[in-house]
Amino acid sequence: MADLSAFPITRKWPAKDPSVIQLYSLPTPNGQKASIALEELGLAYEAHRVGLDDANVKSPEFLSLNPNNKIPAIIDPDGPDGQPIGLFESGAILIYLAEKTGRLLGETPADRYHAIQWVMWQMGGLGPMLGQLGFFVKFAGAEIEDPRPRERYINEAKRLLKVLDTSLEGRDWIIGEFSIADIAICPWLNGLAFYEALDLVGWGDLKNVPAYLERFYNRPAAERGRNIPPM
């Protein structure tokens, strides 16, 4: 049986079966990426609920695995060369799991780079912009008197959604076949409803994106993974 004692996080969130991947997460947009990927790939794993409060994400145990105090994070007891590996950052986790299994990165070397390209687009653009949009639209409210930040993130969200909408023309998935790029993108699109921002970003004017998101969550693995571990 694998020995995960070198990972202090297992003292706060003990592994019932240390031979399988350990997921530390919540079903936020970033958290869903990891759980949906694990479900799509059929990998055995345990999900540990990590609250977003300081007692959890800023605990010494969690910081030992992710010093950036964000979910998700994983430990794979069967990492490179058969040695355990801990990882944080949802994009890195997606790429790792895809490379571990040889799946969800397309059929050709070019497909692989296109999938990674769109993961980076989500990590560097769509996720940060929609996250800030959600803060200023749903949470900040009247406390922010200056309208410019809110307008900036609305406009940038519209721009990014147009990029995605155009790129989806004539295809079901962003690189043509289903990949980790779609797993990176769709949970953030889904967050727009939670942020009550669909009308603000012109969701109804998009030709391809709404059907793309519906298609994504119609996948059984995506439907299962969207609420793991339960809130």
Describe these PLM feature segments:
Residues A98, W188-L189, R226:
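Active-site-flanking alpha-helical
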Residues A92, N208, A221:
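Residue-level recognition of oxygen-bearing side chains
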Residues S64, N218, N227:
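Phosphate-coordinating loops and pocket residues in cytosolic domains that bind phosphorylated ligands
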Residues F139, P230-M231:
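Carbohydrate-binding/catalytic loop surfaces
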Residues M1-E151, I174:
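GST-like domain detector, emphasizing the conserved glutathione-binding G-site
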